[in-house]
A protein has these predicted regions:
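Active-site-adjacent structural elements that line small-molecule/cofactor binding pockets in enzymes
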Residues: 1-306
Length: 306
């Protein structure tokens, strides 16, 4: 299948809106609850669910094998599969085997991770761009036995111009997260029309008895902006050092969708209008997975109308 055909097939399978499986950061959930969550999200009308991983605690591709088997049509993507969790050749083989078993239901999103994750497996992080390039090239290396002959889209976590250029050169697209819609527009222009652009969007739903959604969003955005690379990416979208230091309203509104289901949908639509093929709200998940799923079920009528 030609690269453009892979992208077109992925666009058709994913649809414009998916969702991240709402497991609280740094935690896990019993696999039976995850099966139930995936089935409920499928019944709610979501066509795609994204998961992630760090290093240790779980294996995202094993997780997807369970969830693919538990659902009928749902597309699953890794957002992201961490390159320090498995060798490149193993990642290729595992993804190809899943794609062979479940055609058109897998998107492999890869990310370079962080130095501490490389150190956890006794590896040198190196220069991120060179490390990621080397990993992608090793995925294509021949093995004995060969990997399954199955086609699936590969996309690359990319929030900056250099990693975005690598995504355009060696993969089927990019997976940015936590940036404003103006950055989505720049990324679409840089990628061109023939690459897949999947955007993760932080989402904070107004809940009775909880702090206001915008204030929860402000706290999360402020914490995220402590990462220098994200602060620099935000500056490229025109925000000032003062706005970043203050975490002002305009910055919060640009970096997170918050409020009612209709307001969340409007925030997602901003990215679709800017050129995203697919958007995935990332809920500020609490510890109860199935309660978080209830929130996504309430969101479904508004966001799936996009």
């Amino acid at each position: 299948m030609a690269p453009s055909s892979v992208v077109e097939a992925a666009r058709a399978a994913l649809g414009p809106v998916g969702v991240y499986l709402p497991i609280a950061l740094g935690t896990n959930a019993p696999i039976d609850e995850q099966r139930t969550a995936a089935r409920r999200l499928e019944r709610a009308g979501y066509r795609a669910v994204w998961t992630n991983e760090s290093v240790g605690g779980k294996d995202a591709l094993v997780q997807l094998s369970v969830l693919l088997a538990a659902t009928e049509r749902m597309v699953f993507g890794t957002g992201i599969a961490n390159i320090w969790s498995r060798p490149a050749q193993t990642a290729q083989a595992a993804a190809a085997q899943l794609a062979q078993a479940y055609p058109d239901r897998l998107v492999l999103g890869l990310g370079v991770g962080y130095p501490q994750q490389a150190a956890a497996v006794d590896r040198e992080f190196g220069r991120p761009l060179a490390t990621m390039r080397g990993y992608l090239e090793k995925m294509a290396a021949p093995t004995v036995p060969p990997a399954a002959d199955a086609v699936f889209p590969r996309i690359l976590a990319a929030n900056g111009p250099k990693m975005l250029a690598l995504a355009a050169e060696l993969t089927d697209g990019a997976l940015p997260f936590g940036l404003p819609a103006s950055a989505t527009a720049r990324m679409r222009q840089a990628l061109g029309p023939d690459k897949l652009l999947v955007v993760g969007v932080s989402a904070f739903v107004e809940e009775p008895g909880a702090a206001p959604a915008r204030e929860r969003a402000r706290a999360a955005v402020g914490a995220a902006l402590s990462r220098p690379w994200l602060a620099e990416a935000v500056k490229q979208s025109g925000f000032t050092d003062r706005q970043i230091a203050d975490v002002d309203d305009a910055l919060v509104d640009a970096l997170a969708a918050h409020g009612t289901p209709e307001a969340i949908a409007a925030g997602l639509q901003d990215h679709l209008a800017a050129g995203a093929d697919h958007v995935g709200p990332v809920l500020d998940a609490g510890p109860d997975l199935l309660r978080n799923v209830e929130t996504l079920e309430r969101l479904a009528p508004a966001v799936l109308a996009l």
